[in-house]
Amino acid sequence: MMRTHYCGALNRNNIGQDVTLSGWVHRRRDLGGLIFIDMRDRDGIVQVCFDPKYQDALTAAAGLRNEFCIQIKGEVIARPENQINKNMATGEVEVLAKELRVYNASDVLPLDFNQNNTEEQRLKYRYLDLRRPEMAQRLKTRAKITSFVRRFMDDNGFLDIETPMLTKATPEGARDYLVPSRVHKGKFYALPQSPQLFKQLLMMSGFDRYYQIVKCFRDEDLRADRQPEFTQIDVETSFLTAPEVREIMERMVHGLWLDTIGVDLGKFPVMTWQEAMRRFGSDKPDLRNPLEIVDVADIVKDVEFKVFNEPANNPNGRVAVIRVPNGAEITRKQIDEYTQFVGIYGAKGLAWAKVNDINAGLEGVQSPIAKFLNEEVWKALAERVNAQTGDILFFGADKWQTTTDAMGALRLKLGRDLGLTRLDEWKPLWVIDFPMFERDEEGNLAAMHHPFTSPKDFSPEQLEADPTSAVANAYDMVINGYEVGGGSVRIFDPKMQQTVFRILGIDEEQQREKFGFLLDALKFGTPPHAGLAFGLDRLTMLLTGTENIRDVIAFPKTTAAACLMTEAPSFANPQALEELAIQVTKSE
C-alpha cells in the first residue's frame, strides 16, 4: 500500500498509529544527529523526524532535497510541548520515520515556493505552481463547490444533461471559436459561448429542470476575471416565474457560502437596474461601500455655471454628487489624481467642495465653484446629501452615461483608497428590470442580455412600436461588486421572438438561416421557461479570496489567450490544413 493517510489529516487522534504517507519534501532541516522534513501532499503538511533509532531511514534522508517525491512509513507521535506549532493543522504531532522510499528525485525548481514568482513563471511551470499549498487549497475548494451544486440540484429535481460542444455559430455577443469540418469542407462548427439555445430546446422537450456544469468559449479581449474558456453552472426551468427561479438559486448560493466558508449571507435584497445605476453608478454595485451617488440637477439647473446648468437642463444629462464623510482632509494633490481618474471614463473634470463649517453657509465652504452658488442653492445641496462639517463633496456633470460611469468608478476608488469599503463583509443582491435594449457604438439597438430574453409586460406590437422603453424580465445576482450569475425569463412565443430579431436588424432570411431550428421548435407547444447561469470560476474566486480568476483554474490561459506551458495555440500541420481545405494567409 502506497498510502494509508494524507499528511494534512494527521492529528492527536492518530498518536501511536503506524502510517504510510506519500508526497513531496516541502522543506528539510539537518540538525546533526536528527533530520526533520516537512512532508506535503494535496491535503497539507506534516513534520517527519528521522532519528538514529532507525538508522537506515536516517542515512537515506541525508540525500533528500526539496520536491523529492517520497514515501514514509512510520509512527505518529506527539510533539514535545515546547515544539507544538499552532500555525500548522498538524502542529501537535509528527511522524517518526521507520522507512524511507524515494520515488523520484527532483531537479532544482525554476520556481521558489517561498518567494513571489512572476505570472509568466507560474503559468509556464503550472504543474509545479499547483503544488503550492494555497493553489491546492483553491482547487480543493472548487471541487467542493461543484460537489455541493450537484447535490443541491439533485435534491431539487434538476437533471444533469449534456449539450453539444460542436455546434452552430449564433450571434451571442462575442466572437466564436471556429472548428473546421474535414467531412464538410469549407464549413465550420463553433464552440458554444453558452448552451443557451440547447437548454431552451430541452425545456421544449419536456425536461422542466435542467442543469449542467459546462465549458463555454468566447473569443474576446481578456481581463483579470475573464478567460477564453470558462465554466458555467448552467440552469433552466419550465413553469416557474422569475421570483421562483431567483428563490431556488438564492437558496443554492446561500447554502454554498455556508457549506464552503461558514458564512450566512442572509436574505438577498432586490434592486432595479435604474436604482442601482442612480445610487451606485453600476449594474453590479458593491454594497460594502457606504458611499452613494445623489442627483442634484433640479437644484443647480439655474446656477450661472455652464458645467452644471447645461447637463442639468438636458434630458440626457446628469448632475450628481458623492459625499465623502470626513473627506475634507483629502489633499489638493489627491483631488487632482481623482480628476485624472474620472477622465478615463470620459468626464471633463471633477468639481469639489470641502465643508469646513456646515453652520456657516457658503462662508464655511472651500471650493473653486463656491462663487457660482448662492446661499439658497448651497443649503439645498447640503440638505440633499446630508453634508456635515469635515465632509467633501465631489460633483459629476455631463451626459447621463458619462456621469454615471465616472461617478460609479470614483465611488469604488474612494471606498478603496479611504478604507471605507468593508472588506470583511459579504453583500449579495439581485439586480432586476434591466433595459431590454441598448445602443451599440454605431447607434444600433442591441440586446442588453441576449436576443432570447423576454420583455416584461410588453406585447410584440408594443415592443416594435417603442423598443427603447421595454424592460427585460432579466435578473443578475451580484456579490461584493461581482456579477456571479445572470439570467432571464425566455421568449416562448414565436411572434415575440421574430419581433425581437427584427428590432435587432436580423431580417427573415437571416432568422431562418441562423435560428430556423429555434423558430420551428417554438411552434410546437413551447412552455414558459426561465433560467440563468453562474460563473463557476468567479464563484470560486470569491470564495477563495483571490482577485485573479487564473488562480482558481488548473491550467488557465494568459491575457493573450495563450498557454505558456504547452505553447498553445501553435501552427497546424500543413497536411492537416490541406485535408481541411484551409489555406493560411501570413500577416505582413
Curated annotation (Swiss-Prot):
Q: What is its EC number?
A: 6.1.1.12
- Annotated region (Aspartate) at 196-199
Give residues annotated as binding L-aspartate. 172, 218, 449, 490
In Gene Ontology terms, what is a biological process of this protein? aspartyl-tRNA aminoacylation
Supply the alphabetized keyword list: Aminoacyl-tRNA synthetase, ATP-binding, Cytoplasm, Ligase, Nucleotide-binding, Protein biosynthesis
Complexes and interactors:
Homodimer.
Entry's family note: Belongs to the class-II aminoacyl-tRNA synthetase family. Type 1 subfamily.
The molecule here is called Aspartate--tRNA ligase
Taxonomy of the source species? Bacteria, Pseudomonadati, Pseudomonadota, Gammaproteobacteria, Pasteurellales
